Amino acid sequence: MVSRSSEGAEGPPPSAPKPPNTPAKSRLSRLGSSPSKREDKSRDDRMIKSSAKDVAELKDYQLGDCLGKGAFGSVYRALNWNTGETVAVKQIKLADLPKSELRLEIDLLKNLDHPNIVKYQGFVKSAETLNIILEYCENGSLHSIAKNFGRFPENLVGLYMSQVLHGLLYLHEQGVIHRDIKGANILTTKEGLVKLADFGVASRTTGLSESSVVGTPYWMAPEVIELSGATTASDIWSLGCTVIELLEGKPPYYNMQPMPALFRIVNDDHPPLPQGASPAVKDFLMQCFQKDPNLRVSARKLLKHPWIVNARRSDSVVPKSSTEYEEAVRSVQEWNEALRSPSAGTLRRPVKHDQSPIPVPPTRHTPTKDTLPSPVSRNVTDRFRSPVPTEEEEDNWDDDFATAISPSALQLPHLRPHDNFGGMLSSEKLKAFASLDGTMIKSDDSFGDSDSSFGSSRRSDEPDPLETIRPYPLKQPTAESTQLQELPRSQINKTSMASMHHVPILTQNPTPPTKQPRPASYYKENSIEDYSDLIQANEDVLDSKLGAFQEADENVDPFESSPSKEAIRNRASAEDVMGQQPQLRKQISVKRHRSAVEIQRFAENERDEDFSDLLGTDEVMIDQPESDGSSDQSTLMLNSKLSNNSWLGDQDDEDDPFAQLEEGLDEMDLEANIARDKHARLRNQVEGLVSSLKTSQDEDVLAEISEQLLTVFCDFPETKNIIISAHGMLPILEILDMCRRRDITSCLLKIVNAIIYNDYEIQENLCFVGGIPIINEFASKKYPREIRLEAAAFVQQMYQTSTLTLQMFVSAGGLNVLVEFLEDDYEDERDLVLIGVNGIWSVFELQGSTPKNDFCRILSRNSVLDPLSLVLSRVLDEDGELAEIVEGRIANIFFIFSQAENHVKEMVAERTVLHRVLKELRRMTPAHQITMLKFIKNLSMLSTTLDSLQNSNAIDVLTDLLRATMKRPHFREVSNQILNTIYNMCRLNKSRQEDAALNGIVPLLQKIVKTERPLKEFALPILCDMAHSGKVGRRELWRNKGLAFYISLLSDPYWQVTALDAIFTWLQEETAKVEEHLLDHRPDRPSFTDSIVRCLTISKANAFENLLEPLQKLLRLSPPIASTLARPDLFTRIGQKLHHSKAAVRLNLLRIISSICDSSEEQGGLLAKYGLLDAIRELEHDPAILVRDMAGKLIQSNEKSEAYGMGKRKPMVRRRSTSATPPNLLANQSAPSTPQMNRTSQSKAYYEGKEGSRHPRNALSGSALALRPGSRDGSTPSLTAGLNGSTGASRTRLPRGVSNRMSHVDLLSEEDSARPSSSLSRRQSVLHRRRRQTQADADWTP
């Protein structure tokens, strides 16, 4: 309670003053305020002091300076004149608080005694204030220390948390829930002790019921926010938040407003943990942040956590010296000095190592518990430095890059289409001139799972384009060659491998056995191109080098063929070089220096026909078994027929390799020449056109050239490779960038689109040279439709081919182009709009490294959902499969946006968009309707979007949709999303709850609860929250028999606690009406009393504990209802649970017994009647102080009841009144028992004769009813006025002959001013006779 006042201001908390003579603080105060401000402040302090000294009842104390101010009072330093002790006095205005509850709690909690708890020494009550006398903690709160000196180191936080846990453990064992653990409520002393303050009364001094969510939410547990009630586990959650507060300087979610913070606490798995926290601290916090309070660890278990144990081990909790506070402050100062130092980002210092230096990773700002000092420096910051990680812990990023990038990816830049020299003699062209013997094998253009460097590279058994096949003069074979022809092919392969492995390949970076970091130059393309990386060092190499070419592919990839150096030098033709062509073209100035050595080994030399260097020696070949090469296709075939298909070869001929050399040679040459001549002319024409594409050309000439080039390309698509090899893409892009003639632009865009179609490598090349922004420019609305369509086709290729092109397209502003397409008129530019929709959908569908959230953020800046919602409306007007596909894609885009970060959700939650989407919900197909409902549901999970949803009539539309889909097959999926959305919107908001009630949600929910079992769990929370809404919502509940529905829920073990809490809340708001219905017994429905008794009887362990709190509040609020529970079956159940292991359960059971006894005619005699007297007497020796006190008062009540002769009592008379308040409630029982308890027989006879024959109540009756909360609805008759002593329309019923009468005249006069005249006249005489006596009762001190 000491620090409660600190919530109202940023100053130090109440009993947490700043150290008076600290130089640093005085300097800060001098620097932070001007002389005039200091004078004003001192004047204000003097005024506060003077007003505080006016309290005459504080006769034994001299008030000093004000320690802190809050919303409900102020805290002063005070001196006890009798003992000389310094104390803290907290003054609370009675007008703001329920005095009866304060009185009882303080009376009970002042008996608590523990070193880690601020001692309550008593209180003094005046006419206007309640003065609570507390132990004075001279060093202030942990919050003030953190505010003045900075963040705490982990070891100091662990030491403090150990003491806090000891205090919490004591409180929990006494049945007290702190409810407000935070740094401002943890006070420190000079001895280094920390003490808990503001416990037990914290939730009540705010004047709020447990169902209210008001105030600073950052320390609240999820179950408190969800109105499930505070438990001891709630303190553990708050303790975790306090740890973060001390380590970080701020609690979790401090950068948010209260309502968003509440949503994050409930929805997140756990609050964000400090980034620099050690593993031990993070584990401790995760134990505190268990969402389920039943799984959350207790304070006793947390005391055994390694972090707390180590803290206690390093520094004992027992105070050692008076300088411990200064040491703690110095530790905090040194820690924050280390954080602010220039090397704060690199606190880890590398230790000198025998090996190469270890890269130092970025460090955390918070040390681990294993911090080690540096061996070099002994500065103050060294004690907080993290240890240097070992070699095993170091991250080698070079290894990551070495393994993440495949060799095939790195070698791709060496394979370019222009290396194929046009590809004119493709297999399709040559098919007319040559017959193909053998099997066609389809090559794969994509990356596969094989070990080859490139997916489309030749297979090991395919013909090798690097080998030169040429006829030799007929010659008698030598013995060696004859033997070679007789050996299997596999033996030749294996014997030749030894020579292959020793051939040097001139590469800049030979591949080592293990992956090593590669220099940047490795990724650059060399001007001297090399194909040596395609050579595979395995047995199949020679198969491809020396074998006959039986298998040819119709669709051979352009990258398959590359001419050898020897072939280029000896060709006389100007034709293209392809893997399928019969001859090689003339020498071309293309060099292959790096692979020359490797290829030269396979080139034939007229002067050297010895193959021993390739095939090995005879001895090696003899060692090979024949079975290794038994296949016909694997034998060595150099005796190919060079007639029609000589370049293809025939692997079935094994005899003389040159036997039929001259056969059909002239015929083949004639047909091949025709094909070569045709393609040569075509190539020359295309190369000439490309070379004429210059920006200096006249536009008319450019128009003619571009048109001719387009015509040739359309007739012969294979000219694509010629354009690429002639480097035609760059001239085309230059002209597109400079020229603005539409015909030229249109032709060139068509050529570009045809070249890049489904060729990701060419697309990447185009992106690398800056083609995307140039072509994206033509998507603008200022260009004609034809050009825009071509630009749209280019855009489509960019976003749907590969991840790399997509990333480059987005980086070049491509998403803006897609949004611009969406903004076109759907009627006129339907194709462009659909390209935009499909483009955005494809962006999200591609599985790349860029998160979808980033795309959402980029697109949300352009308000993409606004035009997209318009497109949705137009698409829904159409029929057909295409319209349904587009509808589904739009719905998926909306859904993806709702899964993005909160900033994106806030940007897309525009009223116009939401209104349009909600309007079209009814027209969408069921599957897409559910997807769009998920979009709305996800938006409703963010508090900042709820107003936009409400303004878009979301509740109205969703309620109508729920009603319309009740009979449809997809009702369960639709209602699941709708109910979640309505629950998120109506939660903690009365206006939206009333809006939903007015739209008829209550009967729909009741129907769902009765018929749909799985959906019941979604509907019941909304229904139970309706009791917390305003008059409109409760009126709808009355209309639909909501109270009877709540009573029926008491039989459901999973919802009985929520239902009882709803009934109690409704009773608070409309006490008389609800009480009348609860007491109304009808044969056609179960009574409330029977339901309560059955509920307590059948409830399980956890449900039983949670039922007690709202039940005892309800009985305290309504004595007539409490009197109906004086039943043997209920008392039997209570008797079984009186010895429960938890002190809080025992205490609540005793409070329930007290409320029932007080409302009954027999009062304390019920204990003996139902056999609870012995059990309660045993509880007088309970270890929990509060349980002992309550049990003792019940025993006193029983004894007094026996003394007054309970059997002679007259029945209780209920007086008529115009007030809606139940007539047997006490007017005000805020005063404790006074020496005038036992009044004279004459005064007792006077009361009994005038106002009834009831026997006097004991002190317990006043105590029990003093805890009765008031109604929050000021417009309806409530109990607040009577209980708080303020004016109101309520009328209370005084017990006849009550022993503890009204405490002072002020409260009586306030109550009588609110009474009807008849009641007032009957009381005036009594008031005059008892004025002196009530004046003497003004002190609360027992």
Swiss-Prot record:
Binding site for ATP: 67-75, 90
Compositionally biased residues, Polar residues: 369-379, 1218-1244, 1273-1290
GO BP term, example: cell division
UniProt biased composition (Low complexity): 1-10, 1315-1324
Cofactor(s) this protein requires: Mg(2+)
Molecular-function annotations in GO: ATP binding; metal ion binding; protein serine kinase activity; protein serine/threonine kinase activity
Highest taxon of source: Eukaryota
Keyword Transferase in annotation: yes
InterPro entries membership: ARM-like, ARM-type_fold, Kinase-like_dom_sf, Prot_kinase_dom, Protein_kinase_ATP_BS, Ser/Thr_kinase_AS, Ser_Thr_kinase
Compositional bias ranges of the Basic and acidic residues kind: 36-47
Catalytic activity from the UniProt record: L-seryl-[protein] + ATP = O-phospho-L-seryl-[protein] + ADP + H(+); L-threonyl-[protein] + ATP = O-phospho-L-threonyl-[protein] + ADP + H(+)
Described purpose of this protein according to its UniProt entry: Required for early events during cytokinesis including localization of cytoskeletal components to the cytokinetic ring.
Name the UniProt record assigns to this protein: Cytokinesis protein sepH
Gene from which this protein is expressed: sepH
